[in-house]
């Protein structure tokens, strides 16, 4: 259970996915999770659950509410997943709903963690806020950015200041496509300049894995 969404996945003993669900948590994830658990058992009536693990911002809340077997720290969950798909991963970037995390991997372990500043600028809720303000669903809004011909330079400031920049861009006649692309570029800039702060690409590593729902939109 993350800051803005809830994700559930059921895998079998061969790590094959049997069921997945991804949805906004609406500020109260427990009823949504309960609904999905009931649906899982309805679709797989003979299902024998070996164990249940929770992670994310709602790790302890969900674990205690549903008496789950294990709780896994989010950073370890990110690393474990990345290593499963790329055993020699040496850098992980996660952009979630309200935070951004980067992990440096050395000798098979997390050696350093970089976090965004207190402001949630550059995360999923950042894009969603502007999409809704402009009257668009976030998926459609992000897709419009693919048709930009002159992305607006919005920098990498916090949401409050970015809002004034977007309004000014609209007054200057910028299209929705160019505003969308500009906001997506600002997410990338935020990661590079305020979180990673690498002086060269080589500092990131050679095997990089990206995670988090925001990557669907940038």
What is each residue range found by the language model?
Residues 1-14, 89-106:
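Gly/Thr-rich phosphate-binding beta-strand-loop-beta motif of the actin/hexokinase/Hsp70
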Residues 1-39, 112-113, 117-119:
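Short glycine-rich, Thr/Ser-proximal phosphate-binding strand/loop in the N-terminal lobe
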Residues 22-25, 41-75, 104, 111-112:
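Short beta-strand-loop/turn "lid" adjacent to the catalytic site in phosphate-handling enzymes
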Residues 28-29, 107-150:
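Glycine-rich phosphate-binding loop plus the immediately following alpha-helix
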Residues 37-50, 191-204:
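Phosphate/pyrophosphate-binding loops at sites that engage ATP/ADP/AMP, CoA/4′-phosphopantetheine
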Residues 58, 186, 199-218:
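Glycine-rich phosphate-binding loops at beta-strand->alpha-helix junctions
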Residues 164-194:
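Adenine-nucleotide phosphate-binding core of ATP-dependent small-molecule kinases
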